[in-house]
Amino acid sequence: GEEEYQKMLENLREAEVKKNA
């Protein structure tokens, strides 16, 4: 659902931040 989708996007964003750090 929409909530799961938003959580998934949040997780992807966090992964990108950690990768770029």
Swiss-Prot record:
Keyword Metal-binding among record annotations? yes
Effect of mutating residue 5 to V? Little loss of inhibition of NR1a/NR2B receptor; important loss of inhibition of NR1a/NR2A receptor
Q: Which UniProt keywords apply?
A: Amidation, Calcium, Gamma-carboxyglutamic acid, Ion channel impairing toxin, Ionotropic glutamate receptor inhibitor, Magnesium, Metal-binding, Neurotoxin, Pharmaceutical, Postsynaptic neurotoxin, Secreted, Toxin
Q: Which GO terms describe its cellular component?
A: extracellular region; host cell postsynaptic membrane
What's an example of a GO molecular-function annotation for this chain?
A: toxin activity
Show which residues form the site (Important for selectivity): 5
Please state the span of the N-terminal signal peptide per the UniProt entry: none
Tissue/organ expression: Expressed by the venom duct.
Please name the Pfam families in this protein's record.
Toxin_36
Cellular compartments annotated: Secreted
Please tell me where a divalent metal cation binds in this chain.
10, 14
Q: Which residues carry this modification: 4-carboxyglutamate?
A: 3-4, 10, 14
> Does the record bear Chloroplast in its keywords?
no
Modification Alanine amide occurs at: 21
Q: Which family does it belong to?
A: Belongs to the conotoxin B superfamily.
Q: What does this protein do?
A: Conantokins inhibit N-methyl-D-aspartate (NMDA) receptors. This toxin inhibits both NR2A/GRIN2A and NR2B/GRIN2B subunits of N-methyl-D-aspartate (NMDA) receptor-mediated calcium influx in central nervous system neurons. Induces sleep-like symptoms in young mice and hyperactivity in older mice.
Question: What else does the entry mention about this protein?
Answer: Adopts an alpha-helical conformation in presence and in absence of divalent cations.
Q: What is this protein called?
A: Conantokin-T
What species is this protein from? Conus tulipa (Fish-hunting cone snail)
